Structure formats: C-alpha cells, structure tokens
Amino acid sequence: VIVDAYLKGIGDFDAKKALEACVATANIDSYRGIGLYKKYGYVPYNVTDQYNSENWSLSKTLEYAYDDYCIARMAEKLGDKEVADEFYKRSRNYRNVYNPVSSFMQPRDDKGEFIRNFSPDDYTPHICESNGWQYFWSVQQDIDGLIVLTGGKERFAQKLDSMFTYNPSADDELPIFSTGMIGQYAHGNEPSHHVIYLFNAVDQPWKTQKYAARVMRELYQNTPAGLCGNEDCGQMSAWYVFSAMGFYPVDPVGGKYEIGTPLYPEMKMHLPGGKTFTVLAPAVSKENCYIQSVKLNGKNYDKSYITHEQIMDGSVFEFEMGDKPGQAWYSPR
C-alpha cells in the first residue's frame, strides 16, 4: 500500500522515511519467519518457534518475495540502487519453492527437501486458507519468469486451463473460504483474484474475457448476500469495480492494468484537474463479451494492458465487442 501510494503520487509523506520503515520491517528476523526466509531463501515448513508458530510456510515465502519486490520498486524510484538490488534479488525467492517434478510451488524443510505426499488440491497448514493450485500463481512480480519456470507459454496455458476445469469431486470437503469455485479457482478467496487475467500473458485473452464476464455476472448479485466470499478489506468489491471497467492490476505496484472485458457500454472516471478517463464498449452485452479490437484516443491500440499514466491523462479507450472470441489484438508478449 505504501509503495503503491508513493509510485502513484498519492499522499504527502516522507518517502525516504517510509522506505526505511519498509526495509526495517522486512529485516525483523524475529517476526513470523523472516529470519528463516533470509537464511534459506524460503520459510521451511518444519521449523516453528514462538515467532513462526502458525506455519503457512509456502504462503509466507511467496508473499514475502512479492513484498521484497515492492520495496525494490520504491528504492529504485528513489535512486537507492543498493537497496533495490538487494530486494530485487530477494523477490526471486519464489523460485526456491518451485518443484519441477510436481510443477507446483511446494513446501520445503530446512534441509532443502520438498515435502512428501504433496497434493496441490489439498488444504494444509503450509498454505494460508488456500491450496497449491490457488497459491501457485502468487508471483505477480514476475509472471514472465513464472512462465519460463513452468516450461514456456504452452505449458503455462495448459496449467491455467486446468485451474479452471479441474473441479473438486463430490467427496472433497472444501473449507469455508473456498467459495465461488470455477474448477480450482476460488473467487471467494482473494489469492486467486488475479489468475483470470494471466491468459493475456500467454496470448489467449478471450479466456480472460470469458471468465471475467462469467464471474461478474454470476458471482456478484445486488442482494444482502451478493458477494460470494469474505469482503476482506474491500478486495471483493475492488475486483468488481476494476473488472467492470475492463481492466485489473495483476501487479498492484507495476503501473499496468491487464485488459479484461468491460461490463457496461460507457464508464467515466472523473479525475483531478478536470480530466475524464472514459471506457466505451457500445455493443457489450452478456453475449458480446469478447473484444475484437481496441482503440486509444481514436487510434488502434496493440497492448494487452493500459497504464496508470493513460488513465490519469484522461484517455478514451474504445472496445469493439462481439459474441465470438477474437484473436489477440496486441503484439505477442
């Protein structure tokens, strides 16, 4: 939150002091396994103490790596190369829990051995309120690196397809936080929220559009119980607002928003300085959820994302919509 605010110019605060606080917090060895994370490059699942009692070793490793990336981004912007280099290196620690044999992120012990009898659809103490399917994608800082680690775009796309089609069996006892399920995707629990938008990274944007439209229309209702899961700091609603406008921040501090599918024919965001950001999709409907082409300020647009600067400049994005999947309008990534 601090880094996102700083990079977007929100708030009046001492950025250098804020960075110092972030770095200090990320180096509190006695706090929730951070010392173990720094020592091994991951939090081992078999080491617990008074500061690391709840386990969640895999979740901590992946989330600490993203936090490190955020610190690196802020340090880089402030010109602190030493801190930026250190934390960019730490942000790659996600690789330390990837098991090429299972092709999943997997808990490891303090000897470096991956946990035995691992099943990605099991809910265990090593992953916070999720399973191995849902946390595999928690590398928002380096999706391209995750694709390479997995074996390339084709294999990554196959894994994404499986995420949305591998349904729990009738015998599976799902925990209370696994709601809004599409295959192993759990929209009622926030760790999954960016996964729909990853199809853009493998040049299959029509799947992002299909699933985003489905979630918006089926899993959000204008009723007292209209959300399919815990709101958790407003994230369920934030996902909907972003997605309804046709984009979503896979990497919240990256400055880019992956294009999905707009929900309404016209949406406007009134900005400081009298500017207005506009999204137009005159033909959009339940059936016409597929993007055929995109224009930015009247000119053909060939990116899978929009930028924060384009929003704040008061740009006009226009989407040509259709009822059949269109090919990627953007240059392959």
Q: Language model features by range: what are they?
A:
Residues 1-7:
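Active-site-adjacent, His/Asp/Glu-enriched structural segments that form or flank metal-binding
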Residues 7-278, 283, 309, 316:
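Active-site core of glycosidic bond-cleaving carbohydrate-active enzymes
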Residues 272, 296-299:
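Short strand-turn-strand beta-turns centered on an Asx-Gly dipeptide
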Residues 274-276, 286, 301, 324-326:
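Generic "edge-of-domain/loop-turn" microfeature
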Residues 282, 299, 322:
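Surface loops and adjacent helix of pleckstrin homology
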Residues 287-293:
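Beta-strand-rich binding/interaction modules
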Residues 302-307:
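Short, solvent-exposed S/T- and G/P-enriched segments that are highly enriched in secreted/extracellular
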Residues 308-333:
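C-terminal beta-strand-rich structural cap/linker in extracellular carbohydrate-active enzymes
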